[in-house]
Swiss-Prot record:
Residue(s) carrying Leucine amide: L25
Coiled coil (residue ranges): none
Entry domain remark: Contains two amphipathic alpha helix regions separated by a region of less-defined helicity and greater flexibility.
Protein name: Caerin-1.6
One GO term of the biological process aspect: innate immune response
Keywords for this protein: Amidation, Amphibian defense peptide, Antibiotic, Antimicrobial, Immunity, Innate immunity, Secreted
Cell compartments where the protein resides: Secreted
Lineage per the UniProt record: Eukaryota, Metazoa, Chordata, Craniata, Vertebrata
Amino acid sequence: GLFSVLGAVAKHVLPHVVPVIAEKL
């Protein structure tokens, strides 16, 4: 369903987004 797609996208994107946010903090 939609949530499974969002979950897959989140798992793919989060590892790239978290380091960027950490650097800005």
